[in-house]
Amino acid sequence: MLLAPANRTEFLINGNARPGIYRVIQLAQDQQFLESAEKVVCEIEIAGAPMDMGLPTALPRPNRYYPLIKPQDIERVRTLEFGGAFPGVANPWVGIDFLINNMQYQVEAVPTVVTLGDEEEWHLIVSGPHHGGTEGHPFHIHEVSFEVIKIGDAAQPPGTIMDTIWIPKDTEVVVRMRFIGWPGKTVFHCHILPHEDTGMMQNFLLVDPGGPVHH
């Protein structure tokens, strides 16, 4: 399991083994800014007589219904390019300006407006002459979740619902979203917080169908 910042997962550990101390290990990996050495996450002590406990045979049913989005129902396709510019102008102390669609975060700017009830497909890529191919970024969006359709050429299992996903270098990630909830302004951003805080974030506005656009 590769977890980007803000990813969550659940797993079971089967304790049906000899008594002793067992370690849960985080494996070494080198996914750009997620690079880390192998380390012990925790130690588990198994003791006493074995217990006869049945293990689940299937995943639990979701507690939230998220109907899948059909291609013919997609209202709009958007592309978000995560990149950077050297040397940093807005962030000279960092040395790089982090950008989405070649734009650094502006508090009052709302470059993306979506209509409540619409279903959209977003293509997420890492780009830029200096930035592309050197690192990935975890995309996180507020207020809604998305279905992951493809990571590169690999189609994902139907119903893979997330709100944060790692965009590997040189790879396009395709997601679909249904915009439900209430009107208002919110954000999406890179969840490596120093990247977010130095520009890799954008506002987007949810509006009622046929209603005025205020921001």
Regions found by a protein language model. Give the residues of each.
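Beta-strand signatures of extracellular beta-sandwich domains
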Residues: 138-140
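Short aromatic-acidic-glycine turn motif
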Residues: 145-155, 210-214
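Low-complexity, intrinsically disordered short segments enriched for Gly/Pro and polybasic residues
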Residues: 77, 142, 162-164
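Short strand-edge motifs at loop-to-beta-strand transitions and within beta-strands
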Residues: 7-11, 161-165, 171-177
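Short, small-residue-rich loop/turn micro-motifs
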Residues: 84, 143-145
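Active-site-adjacent structural elements in folded domains
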Residues: 103-109, 158-161, 173-174
